[in-house]
């Protein structure tokens, strides 16, 4: 397999305006707005408070990360494959699907309907999942764009309106996604583009990613997945204990060594929203940064914005995630097989 090297000149190619991945990322705000404006089929009210809430399907863990701290009833994100025995007529089952939902998701959802559970289903109207869950107790949120995050935000807004979680304003979340698209646009020069700058900070290195809060941790895992796909490098999102162990095992650089002699990737520590951590996590971030500095490991930071500008947890999550996904997209563009770079 050819070793990949970074060619930063590719990041200034005017043809990037037509890059399919970048165009998809730029459309995140529009997809969130479309999902918000979709009229639900069926309706629930705040009076219909369930005994418990079960969420299955794509982005179930995102819904859990947002709702778990404030949901007034027991809440669970279920990995499948079977439906828990306790689910019944007093419970709410939320299903996040798409046109080709996994067979176990469809089966679980259909079983929940048979047991009389109240349902919220996000899926295309013509999908197998929508057909399998059609009932008098089902509220369908029709989706059209195939964007699990947009569907999840629409569901979170509905659950917030029902008093089952925090208030989520999709229009504000969409604005946050649009702002990232603007500053990370392929037409923005490298000197002012945080997506391109972050991509170069990650290039030819092994990213070790830490997000201290629940939602930042969720974003860190999604970003690590995107970097692995973009570069083939085993980027790792982990908790502070694991990263502590890895950083302590790093051998400090030999100032006299020839960097071209080793094929081993140097690590880079990526800290998410380090400037917005709750007080109990500030010391953890400082410790990781000191460990990295002690062994000459580069530190790069992804922020969801200035502290003085208030934003909801979901807005911050989307900002972090989109910045990381832009960086992964630019990293893929910049990486060139060695033979082509010569």
Name each model-derived stretch.
Residues 47-181:
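Glycine-rich phosphate-binding loops that contact phosphosugars or nucleotide phosphates
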Residues 85, 93-106, 247-282:
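Glycine-rich, anion-gripping cofactor-binding loops and their flanking helix/strand elements
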Residues 64-76, 224-236, 290-295:
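Short helix-loop-beta junction
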Residues 1-40, 117-125, 129-137, 143-144, ...:
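Phosphate-moiety recognition in structured ligand-binding domains
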Residues 12-20, 24, 28-45, 144, ...:
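Active-site phosphate/pyrophosphate-binding segments
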Residues 75-82, 122-124, 233-245, 296-308:
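A generic structural motif
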Residues 55-59, 96-99, 122-124, 210-215, ...:
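Structural motif
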């Amino acid at each position: 397999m050819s070793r990949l090297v970074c060619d930063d000149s590719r990041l200034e190619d005017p043809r990037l305006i037509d890059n399919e991945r970048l165009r998809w990322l730029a459309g995140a705000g529009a997809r969130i707005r479309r999902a918000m404006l979709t009229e639900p089929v069926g309706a629930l009210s705040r009076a219909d408070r369930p005994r418990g809430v079960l969420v299955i399907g794509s982005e179930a863990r995102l819904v859990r990360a947002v709702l778990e701290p404030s949901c007034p009833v027991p809440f669970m994100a279920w990995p499948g494959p079977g439906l828990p025995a306790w689910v019944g007529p007093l419970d709410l089952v939320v299903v996040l699907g798409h046109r080709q939902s996994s067979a176990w998701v469809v089966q679980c959802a259909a079983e929940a309907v048979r047991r009389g559970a109240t349902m919220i289903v996000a899926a295309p109207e013509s999908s197998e999942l929508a057909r399998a869950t059609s009932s008098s107790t089902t509220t369908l949120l029709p989706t059209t764009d195939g964007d699990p995050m947009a569907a999840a935000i629409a569901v979170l807004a509905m659950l917030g309106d029902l008093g089952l979680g925090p208030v989520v304003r999709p229009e504000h979340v969409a604005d946050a996604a649009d702002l990232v698209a603007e500053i990370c646009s392929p037409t923005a020069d490298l000197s002012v583009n945080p997506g391109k700058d972050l991509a170069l900070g990650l290039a030819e290195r092994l990213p070790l990613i830490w997000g201290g809060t629940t939602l930042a941790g969720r974003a860190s895992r999604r970003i690590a997945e995107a970097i692995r796909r973009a570069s083939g490098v085993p980027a790792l999102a982990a908790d502070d204990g694991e990263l502590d162990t890895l950083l302590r095992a790093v051998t400090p650089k030999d100032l006299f060594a020839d960097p071209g002699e080793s094929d081993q990737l140097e690590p880079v520590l990526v800290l998410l929203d380090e400037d917005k951590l709750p007080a109990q996590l500030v010391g953890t971030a400082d410790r990781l940064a000191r460990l990295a500095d002690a062994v000459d490991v580069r530190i790069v930071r992804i922020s969801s914005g200035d502290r003085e500008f208030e934003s909801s947890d979901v807005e911050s999550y989307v900002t972090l995630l989109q910045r990381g996904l832009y960086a992964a997209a630019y990293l893929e563009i910049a990486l060139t097989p060695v033979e082509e770079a010569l």
